[in-house]
């Protein structure tokens, strides 16, 4: 890879306190007892790509060079997977909330799944609108089982390219379905979410000014190669390995030079996810 300088997607900010949510809802349909999600609805689903590159001067946050490469790569990748892709650029935190609220109110009954990609600066539990921070939980809560009924029991994938802190990883040398007939099931409202983070909790996330972020480059490459062959968690494991072994930061600042990164998968999926059927 060409030695263009790498940047990180971070802006220091006090973390928000997590909220505790109780309760669950019964669902009337769309739940399969098979081991894999039903992906043969008339539509694969929506893929919302929020690409925040330029930030208000008052935030003190730098422009995210290379992010447009990520957005274009993601668009091509998910169109090839038959998703309806909607790209949104430079949204404020209020605009992000409004967009997510409106999308959650759409009828997803003929859609197999939902994907949301967030490209921005971040901290642990935080994504940045162009004018300031937004709690990730605020975004994802619109799609909980008790809030977005037409996506209940369907996979909801959130892909997040952003920093989760300010730690640096120096690295270490190493040797080398079918729906059932039951009328009602009760499932947790937080079930069927998957969060694919670009980096581990507390760490910087790297982005190349020319080629885009390490994580999104790798995710798109692995989806293009394996989406018609492997289950999604297996694909993400290959993404982890690619990022961990094939990338190392290049920076004119010695503090940020020769650093490593490992993505992080947080899954509440209840079945296997295949993009083919």
From Swiss-Prot:
The modification N-acetylmethionine is found at residue 1. This is Caspase-3. It comes from the Eukaryota. InterPro entries: Caspase-like_dom_sf (IPR029030), Caspase_cys_AS (IPR033139), Caspase_his_AS (IPR016129), Pept_C14 (IPR002398), Pept_C14_caspase (IPR011600), Pept_C14_p10 (IPR002138), Pept_C14_p20 (IPR001309), Pept_C14A (IPR015917). The keyword Phosphoprotein applies. The gene is CASP3. Keywords: Acetylation, Apoptosis, Cytoplasm, Hydrolase, Phosphoprotein, Protease, S-nitrosylation, Thiol protease, Ubl conjugation, Zymogen. Belongs to the peptidase C14A family. It catalyses: Strict requirement for an Asp residue at positions P1 and P4. It has a preferred cleavage sequence of Asp-Xaa-Xaa-Asp-|- with a hydrophobic amino-acid residue at P2 and a hydrophilic amino-acid residue at P3, although Val or Ala are also accepted at this position.
